[in-house]
């Protein structure tokens, strides 16, 4: 098969060192390159290969390969070199540089790799949004919670959390942490007396809570609980996924760490999975060391997709805030709705807290239909615009019945967490409010 070689970027800039780099590039027909690029969009593991092949084919600055001098250096055209940043490994310019990087400060080699994988730019943007000293991005929001808990809670430690919590996080706490001798106190989100009692009677390492919480959108006074925790030597970690960094900056209110599922608002397009932990550099560095040993690395294509999503984060969240508030107000007045949970409503028990620490109330509205399990299920089936899925925060509206989607247990088990048969969680997208309202009305009229 014929080959073609390309000169190095340095030679284009007038480098007369005489050492032209060369690379053997398989000469596929243009149609194959297009097909490979299309397939790569469906399979992110091939995206780097597709980009390099396509870039090499399209680059017209081909030169004859120089075999003289007895030296061969790996290289491609400038376009292909740029594309190769979206690969799964970091490449060293010189073999001799590797020992120096290894012997340097622990973060030196990792920094080079993060830059190539795209996560370095991502982490800097997130740190700026959260006003954090440092951020580490990982493969998922769940892994972010696991890495944080595994790093900051010592064996034999004690944690405090709330009844309203992402279910898989709770399952991990209940099943995995006891294997390390870690005990746990679970409190109601608004029960500050129970929090103080737990802090007074246990050697608490960490208080971990969401705010707003899932699915009832309860709000914890971050400044208050941070003072309570710090007075007893405990850390405070806030899962701020339901708020997004646009609406809430927990670190400025006293939290030590903030966790996000970047899958939700941050990426915002329901097409990528990722998570992040932000906070003081001292704490994030500990998580980063654990992360580099255990794995859970955010792949390069995911980094790109999240960076893309962050370009419109503020626009999307502002739109979702506005539409969700209008939807909550509308639902609260509808005769077929028994109750609405939304921190932007004066009827919400922590509305005053939300107003004091949030600039917007988020795009998720939870509510209870005036009906039973079956009528609620039918309502979900009748809506036409929202997708039926267990996620939130994206451009598309999503609706689900937690009793089916997340808590498919016995009714007695659901009652422990307050999950009623008629509960609905509605994640507002960027669709027009009137379109969403009319869709909800027609579905309610059928039950």
For the regions a protein language model found, what residue spans apply to each?
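Conserved N-terminal helix/loop that builds the PLP phosphate-binding region
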Residues: 54-57, 63-116
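Aromatic- and Gly/Pro-rich amphipathic surface segment
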Residues: 97, 113-131, 139
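Conserved C-terminal alpha-helix-loop-beta "cap" of PLP-dependent enzymes
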Residues: 14, 27-30, 336-424, 428
């Amino acid at each position: 098969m014929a080959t073609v070689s390309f000169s190095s970027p340095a030679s284009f800039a007038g480098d007369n060192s005489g050492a032209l780099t060369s690379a053997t590039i398989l000469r596929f027909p243009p149609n194959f390159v297009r097909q490979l690029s299309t397939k790569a969009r469906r399979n992110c593991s091939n995206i780097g290969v597709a980009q390099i092949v396509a870039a090499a084919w399209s680059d017209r600055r081909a030169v004859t390969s120089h075999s003289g001098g007895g030296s061969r250096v790996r290289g491609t055209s400038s376009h292909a070199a740029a594309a190769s940043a979206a690969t799964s490994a970091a490449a060293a310019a010189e073999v001799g540089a590797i020992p120096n990087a290894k012997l340097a400060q622990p973060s030196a080699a990792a920094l080079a790799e993060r830059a190539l994988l795209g996560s370095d730019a991502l982490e800097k943007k997130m740190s700026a949004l959260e006003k954090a000293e440092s951020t580490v991005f990982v493969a998922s929001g769940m892994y972010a919670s696991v890495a944080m808990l595994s790093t900051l809670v010592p064996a034999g430690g004690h944690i405090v959390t709330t009844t309203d919590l992402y279910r898989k996080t709770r399952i991990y706490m209940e099943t995995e942490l006891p294997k390390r001798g870690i005990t746990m106190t679970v409190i109601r989100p608004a029960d500050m007396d129970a929090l103080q009692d737990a802090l007074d009677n246990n050697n608490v390492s960490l208080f971990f809570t969401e705010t707003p919480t899932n699915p009832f959108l309860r709000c914890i006074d971050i400044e208050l609980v941070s003072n309570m925790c710090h007075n007893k030597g405990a850390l405070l970690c806030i899962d701020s996924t339901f708020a997004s960094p646009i609406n809430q900056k927990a670190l400025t209110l006293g939290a030590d760490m903030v966790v996000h599922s970047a899958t939700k608002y941050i990426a915002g397009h329901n097409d990528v999975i990722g998570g992040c932990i932000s906070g003081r550099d001292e704490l994030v560095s500990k998580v980063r060391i654990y992360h580099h040993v255990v794995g859970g690395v955010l792949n390069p294509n995911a980094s790109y997709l999240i960076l893309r999503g962050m370009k419109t984060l503020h626009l999307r969240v502002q739109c979702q805030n506005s539409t969700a508030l209008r939807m909550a107000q509308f639902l609260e007045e509808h005769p077929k709705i028994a109750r609405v949970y939304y921190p932007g409503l004066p009827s919400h028990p922590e509305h005053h807290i939300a107003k004091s620490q949030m600039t917007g109330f988020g795009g998720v509205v939870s509510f209870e239909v005036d009906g039973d399990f079956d009528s609620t299920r039918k309502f979900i089936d009748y809506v036409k615009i929202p997708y039926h899925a267990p996620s939130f925060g994206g451009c598309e509206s999503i609706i689900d019945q937690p009793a089916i989607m997340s808590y498919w247990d016995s009714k007695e088990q659901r009652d422990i967490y307050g999950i009623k048969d008629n509960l609905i969680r509605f994640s507002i997208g960027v669709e027009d409010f009137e379109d969403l309202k009319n869709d909800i009305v027609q579905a309610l009229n059928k039950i």
